[in-house]
């Protein structure tokens, strides 16, 4: 007998193989062994996989359940005839009524690839045989439920077309019935005030929200100047352009009258400087400092209190006396 050479599994393949092997049920194997031996009358042996590997016992099993399912059973020791027996068994149980997802593949049994699936297929086959009336002393497999066909007349079928299940939804709960059109103004009332309910659908409870509170009604355009008043002075605003001091003010400190940025400013202390009594002329310009800043006459008077006499003396008389004997010879 020849065998296929297959090396050990590593990595993910080994992990998957070990996981499949862990699902193998030893008790189910013992029950299947007793059931197959009772139906066929043939011994499987101690090794369940090697006893079913050639496919001979499996072909005899399906022929007992459904006579004539496998016409020819190969008893050769070669690999290909044994694989042919397993393939014939798979076709026979599928024709017997087995579902495709319950059937194992030939390599699962022949190469010991997935004996858990082989075990699942044989248990399902035992349950299908029990459903079809093939009973044994070994209770294995689950009997399938019998199909029950019901027939309804045309009147009941038409009546059922007008009834929909809750899986399709319902129109008996919350809906938008009675809602006003989009954008329509709705009047509000408070149920806590024990007032009567509204007469129409345009009035809703405060629990639904309100559009009567804070708004931008009466607000000025951006950039418009607003007058300010102080609520503590019990002043009343004249119009919507007057706001409280809590909103800020532009009436207090400012930079009005400040000199050009970077220029020096004349400083004096009014405690030590007296106010001027007469006007003062500063270098030909009155009221203007040398640095261009605006200063008063009192500032200049405070800087030079002793040199000021009210006027400047005239050192050069404007009228000259020319006598007869005075002159210039050219």
Swiss-Prot record:
Residues 26-130 form the Calponin-homology (CH) domain. InterPro entries: Calponin-like (IPR050606), Calponin/LIMCH1 (IPR001997), Calponin_repeat (IPR000557), CH_dom (IPR001715), CH_dom_sf (IPR036872), SM22_calponin (IPR003096). The modification N6-acetyllysine is found at residue 23. Residues 279-330 are annotated as: Disordered. SUPFAM superfamilies: Calponin-homology domain, CH-domain. One of its GO terms (biological process) is actomyosin structure organization. It holds the Pfam family CH. PROSITE patterns: CALPONIN_1, CALPONIN_2, CH. Keywords: Acetylation, Actin-binding, Calmodulin-binding, Methylation, Repeat. Residues 306-318 have a biased composition (Basic and acidic residues). The modification N6-methyllysine is found at residue 158. GO terms for cellular component: actin cytoskeleton; cytosol. Calponin-like repeats lie at residues 164-189, 204-229, 243-268. Gene3D superfamilies: Calponin-like domain. The keyword 4Fe-4S does not apply. GO terms for molecular function: actin binding; calmodulin binding. Belongs to the calponin family. Thin filament-associated protein that is implicated in the regulation and modulation of smooth muscle contraction. It is capable of binding to actin, calmodulin and tropomyosin. The interaction of calponin with actin inhibits the actomyosin Mg-ATPase activity. This is Calponin-3.
